[in-house]
Every structure is written in structure tokens, then in C-alpha cells.
Amino acid sequence: MNTPDVKHLPLKIIHDLAHPADIQPAVYRQQVTDTLRDLRARGFGGVVTNVSTQHNYLESDREWALLAVLADACTAEGMRLWIYDERGYPSGGAGGMTLRDYPDGEAKGVVCIT
């Protein structure tokens, strides 16, 4: 059997790659690379993840930098990366940040007219 191209392989959902708040980027890079290689060996073509929800979600420059480390590692390993917001459902709320300055923008319901 031929090995499918990475674009046809499934992505593994990982709700932020957990790490201690004081992790050094080089250590994180090695952990991420090891995780990606393990996933690739198990038939995954990449990951679906988000900025860590553990440490000042979406407002931490450090967390964005660590997400960039993951993105660079995915590129280096030839794997795909999907990024989404995740801190409560429904998705899109960004942990309350979406509506922080505009609470009237919240959807009140969903209607299907056929």
C-alpha cells in the first residue's frame, strides 16, 4: 500500500499542548517535535490546536510565541496545523473576549427558515 500524502492524513485535536508557565522555548520546541514525530508515526498528518488556555488566554505574548514554536515545528516536520479559539463553547467566543467590549453582539438564537 502506498503511503498517503500528508494532506490526506487526519489531524489530531490537542486542546493546547500543556506546559508549565515557565517552560523555556527550547525545551518546549523539543517536546513539541517529539510529540509531532510520535503523531506522524501513528498516522497523523498534523494537529488542530489553540493558544494555551492555561496562562492568560489570548492575551499573553509568551503563549503566542510558544504557538509560533509549534507552527515552526509543524513546518519543519512537514505536518499541517489548524488553529482555532477554544475556551468554552460555542467556539468563536474566545473565552469571553469577543463580546467584552460589545456585549450587544452576542447571538440570541439560531433560526432555520426553510
Spell out what each predicted region is.
Residues L11-H15, G46-T49, L81-I83:
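Structural recognition of the beta-strand scaffold that forms the well-ordered cores
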Residues M1-P25:
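Boundary/entry segment of secreted carbohydrate-active catalytic domains
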Residues M1, L9, Y28-R42, E59-T114:
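Mature extracytoplasmic enzyme cores
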Residues I14-P20, S52-Q54, E86-Y89:
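Active-site beta-loop-alpha junctions enriched in small/polar residues
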Residues D22-Q24, H55-E59:
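A generic structural signal for short coil/turn motifs at secondary-structure boundaries
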Residues K7, A41-H55:
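Conserved, charged catalytic cores of large soluble enzymes
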